[in-house]
């Protein structure tokens, strides 16, 4: 197929959009692949849609290869199925809800576990019908509070979501493994650099869960890995290496001290090192207590205290994952006024216990560890408060930040952190959704068998931005051949009529060989055409320029930055096609 730029719906921009933050956003706008409509909403213009469709094609091929069958559900979904799984409430403000003219509630689908489960239940009733693997590629909707980074975080996006249904856990694990391998093949074909990390399931539910993160400095997800062992996990899923408990017998008694105006960890440590305690005190020796209000879906607000070493900050993502599906907020001044037993800056475990406040601590707070913490009075702290002797928590929580150098949970070495963009997430859901809808089939022994389920998502439209992030230079985009909008960008950089005719004939010859050609036949200067060719990012550029009179054209490799000359003649199109094939 030949597409003429003189007829293509395209306008490139020389300057970056004022609101663009990341390279992919800047380049996809400048190159005319997408255009903004509203915050978090984008239109796909012809070039962008071609890239999107090529990614979809690769995803379909790999899903079909593992036995997937494509279907399509509506994006507008009724309330009832989501009530059955409690996700109507659990999703909170992150979904778009609406009513029809009769007052019936609907949402714009963020994901479709409920509909897939109900459909399979309605169609199949015997173990002989399984396993089943269904998928769709469809628009999804989430009411992002802060859409950002172009099409990386939006309110409408294209996603491939697939669902496996099996009669036993062995079948589920096989389907999960098949998807894991299929995704690795997809990302290899897309030339995306990625890492597979352990993850949390969140509102999706289930047990085993892994994310595929594309390595990128603009990624919103922080992950850690151990270079010695290959362990990798999203920070939300990291399990803190828990020290062994220590005996409490023989430890000095806790002593309350007047510490003056020391409401922060820094001021407390400064006091401790001037108080003659007989040792150097660091923030890691202190226990700070953070107060929250938490509310389960449909419930009331309750107080929750979290204790963690003073040298650690609370990681909002880890805290949110640990409390899922509850929502939470930090206490404000009005809350502290409402609970006078909470002395801000001097909170200790005693007042929490005496007033029935649930208290969860970091896994490093084990029996036998000694701490400096609040004494529940202004200007007073207690030194030598021993866990397991002087206070006991109600449990542990993974809410503290994870740092470079922390020990890996597998004990193999230190952790190092990096940033990534989530491009896929796979879950072994188990029976959460089939339990909600009593999705049973008749087993081989004639008794009911509850189906078990897997869910496997892949961000198709996000992948366009991810590839742009990983494959660009200072001149513009550099699409891998597997997803590029065209195979060859043929630039006519010569006003000579014979050269133009020769370029048109070359485009026809390439078309007959199955090469998709973008022919720049515009009445524009060579400089403008070259800048656009570099910006658009088609992997191969053929220039019909001044060398045409000498019997040569230029072939430029957009990835390698190399240029070579090819002789004109009957074999020119075949020579170019051979270069494309490598």
From Swiss-Prot:
Signal peptide: none
Protein location: Cytoplasm
Membrane-spanning residues: none
Keywords, in A-Z order: Aminoacyl-tRNA synthetase, ATP-binding, Cytoplasm, Ligase, Nucleotide-binding, Protein biosynthesis
Enzyme class, broadest EC rank: ligase
The keyword Thylakoid appears for this protein: no
UniProt-listed Enzyme Commission number(s): 6.1.1.15
Reaction catalysed by this enzyme: tRNA(Pro) + L-proline + ATP = L-prolyl-tRNA(Pro) + AMP + diphosphate
A Gene Ontology term for the protein's cellular component: cytosol
UniProt-listed CDD domains: ProRS_anticodon_short (cd00861), ProRS_core_prok (cd00779)
UniProt-listed PANTHER family: MITOCHONDRIAL RIBOSOME PROTEIN L39/PROLYL-TRNA LIGASE FAMILY MEMBER, PROLINE--TRNA LIGASE
Domain-level remarks: Consists of three domains: the N-terminal catalytic domain, the editing domain and the C-terminal anticodon-binding domain.
Family recorded in the similarity comment: Belongs to the class-II aminoacyl-tRNA synthetase family. ProS type 1 subfamily.
Its biological purpose: Catalyzes the attachment of proline to tRNA(Pro) in a two-step reaction: proline is first activated by ATP to form Pro-AMP and then transferred to the acceptor end of tRNA(Pro). As ProRS can inadvertently accommodate and process non-cognate amino acids such as alanine and cysteine, to avoid such errors it has two additional distinct editing activities against alanine. One activity is designated as 'pretransfer' editing and involves the tRNA(Pro)-independent hydrolysis of activated Ala-AMP.
The name this protein goes by in its record: Proline--tRNA ligase
Annotated source species: Mycobacterium avium (strain 104)
Gene for this chain: proS
